[in-house]
C-alpha cells in the first residue's frame, strides 16, 4: 500500500505515518467512564477509531489496539451512592451495556480493554517517579498534584503557553495548589466515601486522578513510547496535555508520535447536552435507526470535522446505505473477497483512506462502484464493492436481510408485509387491479417498496 498520512494534532499538520517498529502499530484511545449509557458522542469515538484500526490491519500492520475503561471516578462514586449499590455493580452493568452498543455498531473489540481499578499499582509507581523527578508534590489537603510549571513542554499539544491556558481556562481556586493549572495525581480519601473507592499509598489512602490512569495503562500495555493516541477533541486539553506531562515527566522519553482527535457531535447544529434536552444515548438512537445506518452516518463525515446529528441526516444516511445494498441485491458478490487495489475504484479508495482516513471520499467511491454494478450486473464489481466497504465495516450483511430489516417507526413488520403481498396477489388474480394498486400505495406510504419479478414473484424492501 502507499504511504499513509495522518493529521497529527501535536504537529498541526498531516504527516507520513512511520511506525516506531516496522510493521507494527501500537495505538491507545481514551474510552468511556462507565456510570451511564453511552451517548452518540461515544458512538463516534468507537466507530472512528474502529475504522482506523481496521484500515491499519488492512494495510498489513500488526496492530495492538488499547481502549481503556474508567471505572473509578467522582461521578461513579456519586451515582453508586445514589443508587445504593456498589461501584463494581454499577460499572459492571454499564460495561456490559457499552459492549452491547459497540457490538451493534460493528465495532471490533480492542486487543486490550484495561480497567483503571486493575492498574492502581502502576499508577502509584508513576506518581512516585514524578515526585522523585521533582514534578509532583503533596499539598496541604492531602492530594498529590502535578507541578505544571516544572515541566517545560506543558502546553505543546494545545499550542498555548501557561499564561494563555490560565487566562482561557476556568480553573477552580484551590489554595492547596502551587499553580491553578496544577492537576491531581492522587486524591486523598474523604471520610464519607465508600471503602472500595480507596487504596493504600505512600501518601495515605485515596484514589488515582483521571489523567494518571491513561498514562499508566498505556505505558504498561504499549511501552513508554508508542505510535498513535486518539480520542475526542474535547480531551485535547486538559486530559491529553496532562498525559504528555505525566508520561514524559516520568520517563524522560517522547510519549506518543502522533495524536488524533475526532470532532465534536452537535445535535441540530447545537451542542449536545442534557440541559438542552437534545442528549441521545446510543440505545435511544438504535430504537429508531438500524445500527449500520448509524455507523454509515458517522463514516460519511471526515473524522476531524464536527458531526451534526439530526433525524434528517440519519434518514438520508438510511436511504444512501439502502442504495448500496440494493446494488448488491441481485448481483452475487463473492463471499470473503479481498479488495483489488489495482482496479480503478480500489486505487481511489486507497488514496482516500491513506489521506488522513478520508472516509467521505472513500464512500463516494463506493457509490460510483454501486452505479457500475447497477449498469453492468458484474459479479466482479459487486465483489469489489462488498470488499472495499467491508474494510471499513460496512455492507457485511445479506442485502435482502438489510433491505427488509431495520427499525421502522410505523411498526410495520415482515409478517405483516408478507400478508399484504399475499392479499395483493389474490387481488390481482381476481383482476381487482384497483385493490392491488391501493395495497402497493399503502405499503409505500409505510416505507415499503414492492418489486414485481418474473414468474409472479414479488420482493420487497424498506424505502
Curated annotation (Swiss-Prot):
The residues that the entry says bind Zn(2+) are 30, 214, 239, 243
Name any one GO molecular function.
ATP binding
* The record's free-text note on cofactor binding: Binds 1 zinc ion per subunit.
UniProt motif ('KMSKS' region) ranges: 271-275
This protein's UniProt keywords: Aminoacyl-tRNA synthetase, ATP-binding, Cytoplasm, Ligase, Metal-binding, Nucleotide-binding, Protein biosynthesis, Zinc
InterPro entries, alphabetically?
Cys-tRNA-ligase, Cys-tRNA-synt_Ia_DALR, Cys-tRNA/MSH_ligase, Rossmann-like_a/b/a_fold, tRNA-synt_1_cat_dom, tRNAsynth_Ia_anticodon-bd
Location of motif 'HIGH' region in this chain is 32-42
Binding-site positions, ATP: 274
Keyword flag Protein biosynthesis: yes
One GO BP annotation of this record:
cysteinyl-tRNA aminoacylation
As its record notes, the protein acts as a catalyst of: tRNA(Cys) + L-cysteine + ATP = L-cysteinyl-tRNA(Cys) + AMP + diphosphate
Subcellular localization, as worded in the UniProt entry? Cytoplasm
Q: What is its EC number?
A: 6.1.1.16
GO-annotated cellular components: cytosol
| Intrachain disulfide bonds | none
Name any cofactors this protein relies on.
Zn(2+)
Describe its assembly: Monomer.
Family of the protein in this entry = Belongs to the class-I aminoacyl-tRNA synthetase family.
Cross-referenced HAMAP family: Cys_tRNA_synth
Q: What is this protein called?
A: Cysteine--tRNA ligase
What gene, per UniProt, encodes this protein? cysS
Amino acid at each position: 500500500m502507499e504511504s499513509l498520512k495522518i493529521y497529527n494534532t501535536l504537529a498541526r499538520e498531516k504527516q507520513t505515518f512511520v511506525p516506531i517498529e516496522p510493521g507494527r502499530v501500537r495505538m491507545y484511545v481514551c474510552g468511556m467512564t462507565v456510570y451511564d449509557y453511552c451517548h452518540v458522542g461515544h458512538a463516534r469515538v468507537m466507530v472512528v477509531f474502529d475504522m482506523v484500526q481496521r484500515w491499519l490491519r488492512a494495510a498489513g500492520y500488526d496492530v495492538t489496539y488499547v481502549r481503556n475503561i474508567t471505572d473509578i471516578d467522582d461521578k461513579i462514586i456519586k451515582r453508586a451512592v445514589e443508587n445504593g449499590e456498589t461501584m463494581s455493580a454499577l460499572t459492571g452493568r454499564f460495561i456490559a451495556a457499552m459492549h452491547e452498543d459497540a457490538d451493534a455498531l460493528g465495532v471490533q473489540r480492542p486487543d486490550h480493554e484495561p480497567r483503571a481499578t486493575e492498574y492502581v499499582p502502576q499508577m502509584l509507581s508513576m506518581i512516585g517517579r514524578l515526585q522523585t523527578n521533582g514534578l509532583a508534590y503533596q499539598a496541604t489537603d492531602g492530594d498529590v498534584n502535578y507541578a505544571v510549571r516544572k515541566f517545560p513542554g506543558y502546553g505543546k499539544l494545545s499550542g498555548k503557553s501557561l499564561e494563555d491556558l490560565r487566562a482561557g481556562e476556568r480553573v477552580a481556586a484551590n489554595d492547596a495548589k502551587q499553580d491553578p493549572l496544577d492537576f491531581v495525581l492522587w486524591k486523598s480519601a474523604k471520610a464519607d466515601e465508600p471503602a472500595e473507592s480507596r487504596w493504600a499509598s505512600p501518601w495515605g489512602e485515596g484514589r488515582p486522578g483521571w489523567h494518571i490512569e491513561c498514562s499508566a495503562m498505556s505505558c504498561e500495555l504499549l511501552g513508554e513510547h508508542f505510535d498513535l493516541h486518539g480520542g475526542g477533541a474535547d480531551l485535547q486539553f486538559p486530559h491529553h496535555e496532562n498525559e504528555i506531562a505525566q508520561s514524559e515527566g516520568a520517563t524522560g522519553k517522547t510519549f506518543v508520535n502522533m495524536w488524533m482527535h475526532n470532532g465534536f457531535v452537535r445535535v441540530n447544529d447545537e451542542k449536545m447536552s442534557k440541559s438542552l434536552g437534545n442528549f441521545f444515548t446510543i440505545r435511544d438512537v438504535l430504537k429508531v435507526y438500524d445500527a449500520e445506518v448509524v455507523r454509515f452516518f458517522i463514516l460519511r463525515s471526515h473524522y476531524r470535522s464536527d458531526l451534526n446529528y439530526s433525524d434528517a441526516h440519519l434518514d438520508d444516511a438510511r436511504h444512501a446505505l439502502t442504495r448500496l445494498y440494493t446494488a448488491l441485491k441481485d448481483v452475487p458478490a463473492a463471499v470473503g473477497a479481498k479488495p483489488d487495489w489495482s482496479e480503478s475504484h480500489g486505487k481511489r479508495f486507497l488514496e482516500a483512506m491513506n489521506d488522513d482516513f478520508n472516509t467521505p471520499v472513500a464512500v463516494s467511491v463506493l457509490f460510483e462502484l454501486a452505479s457500475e454494478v447497477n449498469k453492468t450486473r458484474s459479479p466482479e464489481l459487486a465483489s469489489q464493492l462488498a470488499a472495499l466497504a467491508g474494510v471499513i465495516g460496512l455492507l457485511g450483511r445479506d442485502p435482502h436481510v438489510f433491505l427488509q430489516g431495520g427499525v421502522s417507526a410505523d411498526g410495520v413488520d415482515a409478517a405483516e408485509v408478507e400478508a399484504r403481498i399475499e392479499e395483493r396477489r389474490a387481488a390481482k388474480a381476481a383482476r381487482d387491479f384497483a385493490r392491488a394498486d391501493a395495497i402497493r400505495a399503502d405499503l409505500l406510504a409505510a416505507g415499503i417498496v414492492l418489486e414485481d419479478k418474473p414468474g409472479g414473484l414479488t420482493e420487497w424492501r424498506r424505502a
